């Protein structure tokens, strides 16, 4: 894996990725690819990016030894990469800062975004306020109901939230609408995609901005324990927090990488969002080719997860490629396992995790007891759980 280079010049990671969009979007994506290529080679761009990550986001985010949880489970030592401590409460802002700086560089006055859990919507509204741009956020009507606190946050930050009533009224449909809007207003509008998916150059660009997670973690773990973890684990929906942790570790062959998809009610039921674990075929959605939950006629299937942010039928193309070349293992945590992990982290560490991140914690909860006390699991705690309090209370039958 020392020679891992992806994507190629056409935006493909092996057989995944690429550019599957209508003719009308090609010029916009070409303009974006050219602008990103120029920015990528400009030290001043990265200087501005690092400045905002430090002074605005509050990076570096620490790594934390979850000693009480580790002791309770008996087995491997669990460490957390604390992305929940970033400004706006999740990893999403790493990417929105980068894309907003690029939008500014390109002279765009307006940004649009899609959001599921609302975290990316909040992070996009935040950077729009920070850089003086107008912002429209597209959000499925069902997700709006699930994530009212984040909807209000976006409005407080000056964004306009557009409810999407079509299809399953979730993230997939919000992304469809945002892409339609981008086609119509490409001259003055920059589309901030929130995950490591979409047409090229988005998967590469989002990954590059999120790699700050893994780069920091490598230096921090070396300092904290004198070596790298035995396992690095992250939840995977579209997969931006996971690729940000994994990518810097791809060349470290003694570090096992584990991506945890949303198992929902079980991959043997229709109610999950686990394209890789369920053996979904390759399909095209939102401008890229990847494993995609679909029926025998190629129609995209409905998904289910207790966490709005993992409720997506596809997966970022680089994850599909890393699965194909067997560098990353993909598995699932079911709703009930994620909820149990959520409770355990609250009780033993005083940390309320996002339900998305709880899927990664669930893998650690399940596997730490099978490992030695001298082994180390690094969990990417991708976000905090304030936004999920209503969902968890409802599931427990508690009225707030």
Swiss-Prot record:
InterPro entries: Trp_synth_b_CS (IPR006653), Trp_synth_beta (IPR006654), Trp_synth_beta/beta-like (IPR023026), TrpB-like_PALP (IPR001926), TrpB-like_PALP_sf (IPR036052)
EC number: 4.2.1.20
Pfam families linked: PALP (PF00291)
Domain of life from the UniProt record: Bacteria
GO molecular function: tryptophan synthase activity
GO annotations of cellular component type: cytoplasm
CDD domains: Trp-synth_B
Keyword Ribonucleoprotein attributed: no
Cofactor(s) this protein requires: pyridoxal 5'-phosphate
EC top class named in words: lyase
Keywords: Amino-acid biosynthesis, Aromatic amino acid biosynthesis, Lyase, Pyridoxal phosphate, Tryptophan biosynthesis
Disulfide-bond pairs as recorded: none
Pathway the protein acts in: Amino-acid biosynthesis; L-tryptophan biosynthesis; L-tryptophan from chorismate: step 5/5
Residues modified as N6-(pyridoxal phosphate)lysine: 92
Catalytic activity: (1S,2R)-1-C-(indol-3-yl)glycerol 3-phosphate + L-serine = D-glyceraldehyde 3-phosphate + L-tryptophan + H2O
GO biological process: L-tryptophan biosynthetic process
Similarity annotation: Belongs to the TrpB family.
Biological role: The beta subunit is responsible for the synthesis of L-tryptophan from indole and L-serine.
Subunit structure: Tetramer of two alpha and two beta chains.
Protein name, entry field: Tryptophan synthase beta chain
